[in-house]
Amino acid sequence: MNRFLLPGGVFLLLVIVLFIGIQRAPQKTVIPSALLGKPAPQFTLPVLGSNESFSSASLAGRWHAINVWGTWCPECRVEHDMLLRIADSGALPLIGFNWKDQDEAALGWLDQLGNPYSVVVADRDGREAIDWG
């Protein structure tokens, strides 16, 4: 019986310390974005599947949503239906940043699942999307 008292006591002490630590921890931690209040980054990128380029200058004065996605990204597949619904509603134009992907794979993905974007740019090296946070 005595051989269980010490380990049991240590375990109980650890549970109490953990419980007190959880109770004293802040409930919500918000890390402010360094990009808030700053102008949107400028970019000029090739349009996916085209020889044309697209510049952020053409977006000036209007609201748009920028979505960074890739065919290799499981979360992108999950959110894709929601993006299609947003596009169908016409509430907000969507600009797609295809990030670090192969053009053929990205075009096939959009053909298969639908294209919610008014324009899709190919951010092949991934540098432009990083500027957007």
Language-model-detected regions and their locations in the chain:
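Short gly/ser/thr-rich secondary-structure transition/capping motifs
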Residues: A25-Q27, P46-E52, V119-D123
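Conserved redox-active cysteine motifs that mediate thiol-disulfide chemistry
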Residues: V68-R85
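N-terminal targeting signals for export/organelle localization
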Residues: M1-P46
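A short beta-strand-turn-helix
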Residues: F43-A65, G70
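Thiol-based oxidoreductase modules, predominantly thioredoxin-like and allied folds used
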Residues: L92-A105, N115-G126
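Short alpha-helix adjacent to the SAM-binding motif of class I
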Residues: R85, E104-Q112
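Thiol/disulfide oxidoreductase modules built on the thioredoxin-like
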Residues: R3-F4, D111-P116, D123-G133
